[in-house]
Swiss-Prot record:
Disulfide bonds: none annotated. It is a single-pass membrane protein. It comes from Escherichia coli (strain K12). The chain crosses the membrane at residues 182-198. This is Uncharacterized protein YjfZ. The lineage of its organism: Bacteria, Pseudomonadati, Pseudomonadota, Gammaproteobacteria, Enterobacterales.
């Protein structure tokens, strides 16, 4: 099952809940399990400026998401409310704390809960699944040391030949982004995340293409990163798009073998 790629932005403060609300223990499906794999290497799991890092989650392992969930829920100012068994009903309460010009952005608890919800109903997430999930955390180059390691989103990828929505008559791609979720508060986070993804797949050619299917409301955001609509697109609700970073030197460059997103 391939779902449309969307961007979700969560506000930095939700006034309906207080940080004293009692968290609700999450329930999740047996497939919603993973462990963090060891980093691929210092040079290939982050963007060239170390603003964000990505870490693979291994769906073939039967360990639960406890490490990720525990780390997310331990952050100051986050409270989980809701249950994961019968539908989406989660909120994350974030204290209205500021760091430099950014709001406190690690709504990791909500993102983790949403990931569990996604996996709960996707039967193709089995031990032999071709999906790869990358957790996204803030890196040492973010500029605010206290935030290093905070979860800000995740990316789900598929090999280029796997997505049903990308037929052979469309431009040839090397990697498909099936899901991309991030939070507000980190300037240009989406570009940094894609740069980190490019570096994680360093075995792909320099002129690689990344494909995705975006909701029409998010297409302009991806266009700003250099993504182009496929010429044959007729679906008005979704837009299949692809990015060739090498064709956009004003946005993307390589230094010492690492992709860098040039917008600050």
């Amino acid at each position: 099952m391939t779902l449309p790629t969307t961007i979700y932005s969560f506000p930095a403060y939700l006034s309906r809940f207080s940080s004293t609300d009692k968290p609700v223990k999450l329930k999740f499906h047996q497939y919603a399990r993973a462990t963090l794999l060891s980093n691929r290497g210092r040079d290939h799991n982050c963007d060239g400026r170390r603003t964000v890092e990505i870490h693979k989650l291994d769906l073939s392992d039967w360990q639960a998401f406890n490490k990720l969930a525990t780390r997310c829920n331990a952050y100051d100012g986050i409270t989980m409310n809701g249950d994961n068994s019968f539908g989406w009903n989660h909120e994350a309460t974030l204290d209205n704390i500021h760091a430099q010009k950014y709001n406190k952005a690690y709504a990791g608890a909500r993102l983790t809960a949403e990931l569990k919800y996604l996996l709960q109903d996707v039967e193709s997430f089995e031990p032999n699944s071709k999906y790869t999930i990358h957790e996204v955390v803030l890196g040492p180059g973010y500029g605010t040391p206290d935030y290093t390691g905070q979860t800000i989103g995740y990316v789900v990828t598929l090999p280029a030949q796997m997505p049903n929505c990308w037929s052979s008559e469309l431009p040839t791609i090397d990697l498909y982004i099936d899901q991309l979720r991030t939070v507000t508060g980190v300037s240009n986070a989406l570009g940094f995340i894609i740069a980190a993804l490019l570096n994680a797949y360093s075995d792909l050619p320099h002129d690689l293409k990344i494909g995705l299917r975006s909701l029409s409301s998010s297409a302009a955001i991806y266009s700003g990163l250099g993504f182009e609509r496929v010429p044959q697109e007729r679906d008005i609700s979704c837009a299949r798009m692809y990015l060739t970073p090498a064709n956009h030197p004003d946005l993307w460059t390589q230094e010492n073998g690492e992709w860098i997103y040039l917008r600050n």
